[in-house]
């Protein structure tokens, strides 16, 4: 007799860290993201993070989605949404850095944001913002009307 084994995914949840941190503005989100970006690599390598929030906009968790070269990073929408579903997030805020120091969103930044927004809407998860960080400043897509 032959059995097919199906791998099991196990989720573990622990309330610690930023779990009571309320994110009510782009500035609040940037403050949380800056705690997780590597300051020594902010001007060297591009990284992409997702911040997951509950219905009260309290932090459920943060996840590094990718880290790559000096001018781009690979972002898989499925990975962002998978984590949102696993932690029962009601909202997501994205952030990535521009090692160049330029805060202007690229065409690719706008395109991936729209892809993530479409996926999040389908899953009834709100994409609240996408922030671009540099070592000296930040830009909020929501504040600039890009969302």
Place the predicted regions along the sequence by residue.
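Active-site-proximal loop/helix of nucleotide/amide-processing enzymes and allied scaffolds
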Residues: 1-15, 31, 54-56, 71-147
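Glycine-rich, small/polar surface segments that engage phosphate groups of diverse ligands
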Residues: 19-78, 83
């Amino acid at each position: 007799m032959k059995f097919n084994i199906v791998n099991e995914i196990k989720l573990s949840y622990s309330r610690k860290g930023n779990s009571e941190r309320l994110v009510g503005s782009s500035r609040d989100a940037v403050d949380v993201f800056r705690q997780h970006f590597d300051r020594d690599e902010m001007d060297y390598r591009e990284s992409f993070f997702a911040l997951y929030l509950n219905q009260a906009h309290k932090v459920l968790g943060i996840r590094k989605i990718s880290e790559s070269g000096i001018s781009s990073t690979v972002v898989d929408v499925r990975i962002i949404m998978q984590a949102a579903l696993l932690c029962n997030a009601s909202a997501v805020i994205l952030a990535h850095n521009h090692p160049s120091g330029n805060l202007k969103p690229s065409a690719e930044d706008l395109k991936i944001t729209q892809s993530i927004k479409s996926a999040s809407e389908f899953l009834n998860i709100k994409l609240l913002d996408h922030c671009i960080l540099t070592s000296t400043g930040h830009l909020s897509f929501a504040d600039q009307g890009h969302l």
